Amino acid sequence: MIKPLTNHGNKNIYPDNSTLIVILGPTAVGKTSLSLQLARDINGEIISADSMQIYKDMDIGTAKASQKERNIIPHYMIDIIKPDQEFSVAEYQAMVDNLIPGIVYRNKVPILVGGTGLYIRAVIEGFLFPEMDKNIELRQKLQKEAQQYGNKYVYNKLKKIDPELAKKLHPNDLRRVIRGIEVYHQTGKTMTYFKKEKQKKGDRYRNLKIGLYREREELYKRINKRVDIMIEQGLIDEVKYLLTKYPDLSKTARQGLGYKEIIGYLKREYDREEAIRLLKRNTRRYAKRQLTWFRRDQDINWFNLSTGDYKKIYSEIKKLSRDFLLDF
């Protein structure tokens, strides 16, 4: 039997294998500091839901929690692969599914924290990823066709197989286009079919979603300041080191915010000031896309951190979390 975590009035708070607290929101909104505070107060451990923090040696540009912070509260799904390796959403989902029972066994509350909506969705809703081996031969064939005839040529193949998926993808999103074709060739069923099957099953974890946001002007100021701090901390040297240590950086790592802009500068495509300007602009645009993604979800409990009374807001979040843990 799992021991109670905390006394709360006359009740006890118990973690549960199917229970998960989620803290989400755009970049630079303040997720890290709030999640650390909440984890201390409800005896939690943090699982990162950030698609860039999975990479080793990419520290400054991904704004990882410091080693000191990680020593206070255990963090997972940070520094798990090298930047020259690929990592799929399916792998992320599987690893988190394996982590949660261990966290609960230690009488801790799993807290999923991040801004990568696809990762959060994969854990909570689950994707029915077909179990199949990679078809390297087919992938190479399709990649060669894309080089010879253009991405649209391969995209049109997907359009014939899975028109619903094709509508959601840009022809230049070649990796996902090829994946859609590969799934059909390997299983005889489309990605759209697997998605619809998943939707019939409902959420995989009982969850509380806490969304953080700030007024646009304040958020953008925080983003600009964060970029300036990253540059001061040595982001340019970090990118130089990465390119030396990992000459074959994965496409995902190479295209990461803060990395693609500095890589362009190091290639002399533009000067240092332009790299910083681009990084600030691209990060602001990314934050906007994150909010657009999250606002589709009607189950998120939103908190505006721009109101000025942080103690009151945090108190509400803590109470909401405790009540959620009690109510099962």
Swiss-Prot record:
One of its GO terms (molecular function) is tRNA dimethylallyltransferase activity. It holds the Pfam family IPPT. The keyword Lipid metabolism does not apply. It catalyses: adenosine(37) in tRNA + dimethylallyl diphosphate = N(6)-dimethylallyladenosine(37) in tRNA + diphosphate. ATP binds at G25, P26, T27, A28, V29, G30, K31, T32. It comes from the Bacteria. Its cofactor is Mg(2+). Signal peptide: none annotated. The keyword DNA-binding does not apply. GO terms for biological process: tRNA modification. Keywords: ATP-binding, Magnesium, Nucleotide-binding, Transferase, tRNA processing. Residues 50-53 are annotated as: Interaction with substrate tRNA. Substrate binds at T27, A28, V29, G30, K31, T32. The record marks T116, R139 as: Interaction with substrate tRNA. Its EC number is 2.5.1.75. It is an enzyme of class 2 (transferase). Belongs to the IPP transferase family. NCBIfam families: miaA. Catalyzes the transfer of a dimethylallyl group onto the adenine at position 37 in tRNAs that read codons beginning with uridine, leading to the formation of N6-(dimethylallyl)adenosine (i(6)A). Monomer. HAMAP family: IPP_trans (MF_00185). This is tRNA dimethylallyltransferase. It comes from Halothermothrix orenii (strain H 168 / OCM 544 / DSM 9562). The gene is miaA.
